[in-house]
Amino acid sequence: MKERFQNAIVADLLMTKNENGKKQILLSKRKNTGYKDGEYELPGGHLEENEDLYEAMIREAKEELGISLKRENLKIVHIMHHYTGKRMNFILETEKSDLEPRIMEVDKCEELKWVEINNLPENTMEKVKIIIGYIEKGELYSKM
């Protein structure tokens, strides 16, 4: 019997704010992880056992950014299916409002940076660039 294909589920946060009429997003610069260190990514992480997508995003935001998100303020804006990496990234958007993100995992994050959504740093992970492109076009699903 053929074994079922299994994917890891990842919740990524697209935190946005409006600065001088331009949409900005929060990026996290990786360090000491052994994977894509020195590159910017969206904050987030894998679901844990018995956790739903929103619970994972709320937990990850608290662990990585020190902020308390509410389920009703999160909206799924994109799903990326990685065939080769065997995972699915769910991108959840929230507006910054009065939240003040800060680096909580100093051993894994070198910097938090607000950037214009249409002017990402050169060293942004390729998957993030692709995801942002799809979100800007209003497309909910992509594969890589």
Identify what each model region corresponds to.
Residues M1-I25, V77-I79, E93:
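Conserved N-terminal beta-strand and adjoining loop/helix that marks the start
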Residues F5-A8, N20, G34-Y35, T84-R87, ...:
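A generic fold-level signal
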Residues A8, K17, I79-R102, K113, ...:
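Active-site-adjacent beta-strand/loop module that shapes the phosphate/pyrophosphate-binding cleft
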Residues K137-M144:
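Acidic/histidine-enriched, glycine/proline-rich intrinsically disordered or flexible terminal extensions
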Residues K22-E63:
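Conserved Nudix-box catalytic region and its N-terminal flanking loop in Nudix hydrolases
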Residues S68-H78:
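A short coil-to-beta-strand element that immediately follows conserved catalytic motifs
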Residues E93, I103-E136:
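NUDIX/MutT-family hydrolases
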